[in-house]
């Protein structure tokens, strides 16, 4: 039985990002503006529009992103897909939390062997720099932060099976959502 790492809930992502954002410079007001600090993994990047992510999944294996709108805030979409890609080690589950069709949080999760996990680590470290792996309960994680964005590689072994996930968070998208919610709630 494979134990999947859970995708962060939007509220949890906001709390985690508040800690990350406090040390980051102020974000531009346009949450979809492109710049070179965009953290990405295998073409997936937080801050991408849902159409871009759906196209990427379709190009990788022909699948599609399936989205449901939140009942409480119709601007929020929770999307899922599964893709098969040999470069990622096989079947990968994809979760996206989007606000106004822009991805604030993306999580890719898969059962991996040691070689695949090492390949994921090397790919990220060669692109973003070496960071030490840190224990987090029964899991291990490596994290990179750039200009209000975060990429985290997390892995664990449970009953002999290794599961890894990459989470990409765009604080600009989540911060803008928080500002709009606060403005709508104030009299």
Where are these regions (language model features)?
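Bacterial N-terminal signal peptides that target proteins for export
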Residues: 2-12
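Bacterial N-terminal signal peptides
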Residues: 10-20
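C-terminal region of N-terminal signal peptides and the immediate post-cleavage residues
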Residues: 22-26
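Non-cytosolic coordination micro-motifs
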Residues: 27-77, 107-187
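A low-complexity, Ser/Thr/Gly/Pro-enriched, surface-exposed linker/loop concept
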Residues: 72-86, 90
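Hydrophobic/aromatic beta-strand elements that line small-molecule binding cavities or substrate pockets
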Residues: 92-97, 153-155
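Glycine-rich, often proline-containing surface loops adjacent to acidic residues and nearby aromatics
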Residues: 99-107
